[in-house]
């Protein structure tokens, strides 16, 4: 399913600034997981690691330029890189706030926990809290490891640094996990998660053939659901969003989800423009 959000054209002067607030830093496009919806699972995929030989100098330049924060990775898995904690420390030791996206599939060492506990924002890629389903969808990951890592980080943060990193749970929303969103939010709240993100699935059509040879059912965008299933999915999303806010957190629903749902509803003859923040718009 294609993301319906269109690109925005910028004039050159729009990019001029006297200060860079946040740097998006791609440490690697490699990943230790092979999620059943991700292009990394394709045999033709080739990732690449950043050359960290000059990382200290890069971090120093950022500090001198008054960069406030560095967002590390949004695609590959930083914590699979040897020495990743030291690379992150280069920014932290210079007063630059660090945010990271990780699948938390490794059991982290005390040194790694310490570095993570100093961060400002940690996004954990976790699509469901159903352990067996999580293994089927994301492969090579265990819910228990994720939860343990989170609590170890929170303990270190509050006991040594007198703060908590903000935890954001990110779910790539698919037909296989949408029914479990309520449990996903509840488990997150119980473990100190403050923010939840529903990610819009960008489908790779080749995956069905490649993974189908091994009997793997590839997740689909919820916009491909039938009428009854789609209506139920809409209510599941809205209920999870409400629960997140009632629990003191919030939820981001990425562009492409509502748009895909509304286009599908129109195909099914349901004249509704769903707004997940407004229950009266639900079918």
What label would you give each PLM region?
Residues 75, 103-105, 127, 172-174, ...:
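Active-site beta-loop-alpha junctions enriched in small/polar residues
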Residues 100, 124, 169-171:
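Structural beta-sheet core signal
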Residues 81, 107-110, 177-181, 261-262:
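Short, well-ordered alpha-helical microsegments
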């Amino acid at each position: 399913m294609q993301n319906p959000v269109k690109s925005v054209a910028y004039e050159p002067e729009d990019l001029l600034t006297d200060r860079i607030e946040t740097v998006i830093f791609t440490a690697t496009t490699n990943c230790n997981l092979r999620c059943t919806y991700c292009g990394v699972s394709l045999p033709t995929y080739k990732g690449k690691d950043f050359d960290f030989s000059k990382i200290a100098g890069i971090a120093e330049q950022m500090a001198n330029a008054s960069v406030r924060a560095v967002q590390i990775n949004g695609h590959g898995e930083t914590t699979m890189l040897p020495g990743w904690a030291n690379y992150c420390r280069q920014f932290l030791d210079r007063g630059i706030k660090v945010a990271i996206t990780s699948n938390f599939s490794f059991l982290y060492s005390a040194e790694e926990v310490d570095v993570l506990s100093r961060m400002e924002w940690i996004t954990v890629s976790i699509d469901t809290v159903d352990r067996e389903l999580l293994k089927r969808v994301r492969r090579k990951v265990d819910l228990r490891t994720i939860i343990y890592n989170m609590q170890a980080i929170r303990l270190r943060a509050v006991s040594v640094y007198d703060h908590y990193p903000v935890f954001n749970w990110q779910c790539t929303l698919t037909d296989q996990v949408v029914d479990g969103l309520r449990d996903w939010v509840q488990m997150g709240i119980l473990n100190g998660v403050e923010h939840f993100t529903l990610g819009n699935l960008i489908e790779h059509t080749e995956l069905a053939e490649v993974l189908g040879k091994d009997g793997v059912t590839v997740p689909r965008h919820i916009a491909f659901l039938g009428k009854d299933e789609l209506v139920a999915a809409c209510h599941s999303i809205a209920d999870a969003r409400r629960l997140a806010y009632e629990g003191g957190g919030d939820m981001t629903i990425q562009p492409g989800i509502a748009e895909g749902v509304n286009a599908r509803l129109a195909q099914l003859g349901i004249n509704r423009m769903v707004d997940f923040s407004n229950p009266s718009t639900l079918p």
